[in-house]
Amino acid sequence: MSIVKVSYFSDILCIWAYIAQARIDAVKQKFGDAVQLDHRFCSVFGNTPLKIPTTWRDKGEYAGFNAHLRNVALQFPHVEVHPDIWLTTRPPSSTAAHLFMTAVLQWQQEQEGEGASEATAQIFEKVLWAFRCAFFRDCRDIARRDVQCELAQAAGADVGAIEKRIHDGTAFAALTSDYQAADRMRIEGSPSFVLNEGRQKLYGNVGFRIIEANIQELLRAPGADQASWC
């Protein structure tokens, strides 16, 4: 069976990645094991005290960004956005959450190598979604380690093993690789789907049908030397 590998870059504080989760779920439901999704992180909100006041300087700064996010959410009824987002809770960086999630992924992969249950094999995505909901829906600061540990533990992750990977530096190394890969592949922002060994990149608010068409074309003509028409 042909397998399409998709590298999926996102920033955990990006509303478009929060919205795109429904498309990720649809891809998994339609294609199953024919698609191998590789979650990776890129840095869009790495320094929010600089980014938001600068980017939104002439548009109301945090209040303007808050209004923008709430207006965006109105177009997508499958997601919820807290009315006080970025007003009462302002994570200084997405990097803290990315680091923790990278350690979660490392732990999960190790468990899979030891014959983990199907439930354990899904913990990374459960924690990732819990982080996004905690921020966008519940207005919690997911840059805080105590919040991260609480959410991970509730999802069934081994918090001690996860923190070990942060303390010994292995999670830092893997996250650095993600950021370097994003630069090397010229990832423009979050979310970005990279297919066909980097030949195809889908960036931003991309509809499921476009993602589906690209995957179907690669399944039809999987050879690495064949360029997709999509």
Task: Specify the residue positions occupied by each region the protein language model found.
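Extreme N-terminal starter segment of soluble prokaryotic enzymes
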Residues: 1-7
